Amino acid sequence: TSGIPKLIKKMADDEVKFKLAVSLHSAIGSVRTGIMPFNEQFPLEELREALAYWYQKTKNRITYEYVVWKGINDQKKDVEALIKFCKFAPSKVNLIEYNPIDDGLFEQADEKALLLYKRKLEEAGITTTIRYSRGKDIDAACGQLANKQ
């Protein structure tokens, strides 16, 4: 989910039997809004409150999906904000390698940035995985829909 707070709370109240994964991509409000304009309607503070409620009711760890882009969310301040955002409840972060497309607005972050994220998150006690892409050499990776001529 991208995180509609009232629906996260409703799912917690309904005692749903699945795990929650949130597409976060930034724990800095202005950056997240640039990536996901949806954030203007449902700011991070409201999302965090709903996630705290989710954890309080379900005791289930929260998973965050987090694509790291070059020049957008690949700096030290970004990982520090993510650590702070995650600390209120047990969580897992899936760092996702971006699959570039021709003429795309986003660029894949350097592997060094992904490894820094992973190290810093793990040092903070947050379970972290890096999801590396396969198939991007033939435009068949997740998120790629390309038509090369």
List PLM regions with ranges.
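Conserved AdoMet/S-adenosylmethionine-binding subsite of the radical SAM
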Residues: 1-120, 124
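Structured C-terminal cores of nucleic-acid metabolism proteins
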Residues: 112, 128-131
